A protein has these predicted regions:
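HTH-adjacent hinge/linker in prokaryotic transcriptional regulators
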Residues: 2-26, 30-101, 112-120, 135-139
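Short beta-strand scaffold positions
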Residues: 102-103, 125, 234
Length: 255
């Protein structure tokens, strides 16, 4: 069985969970036309990744998988996110014709607010709010195509991935959902994880921005190992244990 078919099947399970809140093994066997054993292995693997909680005869969606809208996220921990964004500016030289990619993270949005004051940049983004910051003629802005997710006003899907694969990015700016008990950057959906992976693969440098609260929250999908990132910037609220782990795996900056 190909890795692609496994991912597609588990994505369908996630869609069922998102729509209903819970699923039964017998129903999934019928809908997906696979064996009882295959479904149970899928549910076990998804539970280990923090996506669901197995129960007798099925599974339920874990409560922390609920997405928050971009407006709400942008107003949380604003002082901390501003500090992280200002630190990131030091690693993005002004006056150079850089190609800078942004995902739909709220801390990424905070950094974009500062970079919007510069000129001569090429901006690539999956986020409509980020694209709207770079108005006027000072910068070239490319908004990824694809399907619109209303929750955070971002675009995703194969069109977006095809576009990313055709370009070379100078710096990829990445946010993350909760990373508690995970080995790297996380996302709330498989589609968002795909965007992050594509950015990392096609960039010269990747910088992750995440406030320390993310280390206390669980998340659905792991999108990249810490070792794949060139830099992680967080605030001084990070616990010593998490600091030690990240310092061994990537260039960790604490502000």
């Amino acid at each position: 069985m190909s890795a692609g078919s496994v991912v597609n099947r588990r994505n369908k399970i996630l869609q069922q969970l998102s729509a209903k809140g819970s699923v039964r093994v017998t129903d999934l066997v019928e809908v997906l036309n696979v064996s009882d054993e295959t479904i149970r292995k899928d549910l076990q693997a998804m539970e280990e990744r923090g996506i669901l909680r197995r129960e007798h005869g099925g599974a339920t969606l874990t409560s922390y998988n609920e997405e928050e809208d971009v407006g709400r996220r942008s107003t949380e921990n604003t002082e901390v996110k501003s500090r992280i964004a200002k630190e990131a500016l030091k690693y993005i030289p002004a006056g150079e014709p850089l190609v800078i990619a942004f995902d739909a993270g709220s801390t990424s949005y905070c950094l974009a607010q500062f970079l919007a004051q510069r000129s001569g940049q090429t901006i690539i983004t999956s986020s409509i709010p980020v694209a709207e910051l770079f108005n006027g003629d000072k910068n070239d802005v490319y908004l990824l195509g694809g399907k619109l997710r209303q929750k955070d006003r971002s675009l995703y899907g194969q069109w977006a991935l095809n576009f990313i694969s055709s370009i070379r990015i100078s710096v990829a700016i990445l946010g993350s959902s909760g990373v508690k008990n995970r080995n790297g950057l996380c996302a709330v959906t498989f589609d968002d994880a795909d965007i992050k992976r594509a950015y990392i693969k096609n960039s010269e440098r990747s910088i992750a921005l995440l406030d320390s609260s993310k280390f206390h929250k669980c998340s659905m999908v792991e999108s990249a190992k810490w070792e794949e990132l060139d830099m992680v910037i967080t605030d001084d609220g990070i616990q010593e244990e998490d600091r030690e782990v990240l310092s061994k795996k990537t260039n960790l900056i604490v502000v």
